Amino acid sequence: MGQSHTHDHHHDGYQAPPEDIALRVKALESLLIEKGLVDPAAMDLVVQTYEHKVGPRNGAKVVAKAWVDPAYKARLLADATAAIAELGFSGVQGEDMVILENTPAVHNVFVCTLCSCYPWPTLGLPPAWYKAAAYRSRMVSDPRGVLAEFGLVIPANKEIRVWDTTAELRYMVLPERPGTEAYSEEQLAELVTRDSMIGTGLPTQPTPSH
């Protein structure tokens, strides 16, 4: 009722290397910490910076430009990979992008049910909860309930579409623009949150002073 699940998850041929690389990185990290060459707190800070600030700021610029530039938005919806590359954001985990536009009638959210595929060039590193089995399974079976746990209550008359990322394809949500007619593109980008581009949140509402 008011929700659908787009399951197009072709992980055939999705080999072990990503997991192998992750294990090697973890082993190297443990060795460096053990030898006192790396401060674990400092490493956590770097990860948090890329997870919350550096990566998502790229996506925020894409969203803000789409909000203010109808021609760019049209290109973004038609060929997201090329339109995102126009702003200089491309690379590993972002070779084939699709933009999911939220509307007054439809709210989009994406998940990777089999692993943790995520659009690194625009959103940075995936948050821990995105990789968790609970999110990956429950977002498909009970999206409305899971979104409510994130503090995002979707009206019953609004359709929720859950998109399952593939090994080849990466999604990013284009959230609805808040009431910000007087905002510049740069100001709008500051309102775009990482979670609003995943679909588990909304953009920050503008302050009354604006």
From Swiss-Prot:
- What does the note accompanying the cofactor annotation read? Binds 1 Co(3+) ion per subunit.
Q: What residue stretch is flagged as signal peptide?
A: none
The protein's UniProt keywords, in alphabetical order, are: Cobalt, Lyase, Metal-binding
Chain residues that bind Co(3+): 112, 115-117
Instruction: Give a yes or no for keyword Oxidoreductase in this entry.
Output: no
- Please give the catalytic activity noted in the UniProt record: an aliphatic primary amide = an aliphatic nitrile + H2O
What Enzyme Commission number(s) apply to this enzyme? 4.2.1.84
Instruction: Tell me one GO molecular function of this protein.
Output: transition metal ion binding
User: Where is coiled-coil annotated?
Assistant: none
Which cofactors is this protein said to need? Co(3+)
The record's annotation in InterPro entries points to: CN_Hdrase_a/SCN_Hdrase_g_sf (IPR036648), CN_Hdrtase_a/SCN_Hdrlase_g (IPR004232), CN_Hdrtase_asu/SCN_Hdrlase_gsu (IPR023900), Nitrile_hydratase_asu (IPR018141)
Q: Report whether Iron shows up as a keyword of the record.
A: no
Q: What class of enzyme is it?
A: lyase
Question: Which family would the database say this protein is a member of?
Answer: Belongs to the nitrile hydratase subunit alpha family.
Subunit: Heterodimer of an alpha and a beta chain.
- Protein's name in the database: Nitrile hydratase subunit alpha
User: What is the gene name?
Assistant: nthA
